[in-house]
Amino acid sequence: MTKEGERNVNSFIERFLDLLFPPRCPFCRAILKEHETRICAGCLQTLPRVPLSLQRQTFRHIEACVSPLYYKDDVRSSLLRYKFGGLYTYSQAYADLMLDCLETNGIDADLITWVPLSDKRLRKRGYDQAGLLADKNLAC
């Protein structure tokens, strides 16, 4: 099968799965509307965003540490579902928020990396959630 044929088959499978299991917002769990990509419009407006003036922190041996959202309420619940509930499909939504935060803060990262899970935790969870985020952001 050609590459284009593979893409068509994969696209068909994705659309079919979306019919059976519609994509949901990782924060409020509402079914996404056709025009919404990864995060619903309501959550995009109401997520507890860290103000730009507080996003970028510096430390003694670290050039910068940034965060797009406060870790509370729906954000906290969403991250816990991602980390412990096997909802690895949330990774692209989180990666998009992280990349936006990097760009907003003028950080030109050459590489995104992570500390891998131990073998024991990897077996328990079935996937390395931090590794997925790093993988989604490698195109930074």
Regions of interest found by a model, annotated:
Residues 1-140:
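Glycine-rich phosphate/pyrophosphate-handling loop used in enzymes and phosphotransfer proteins
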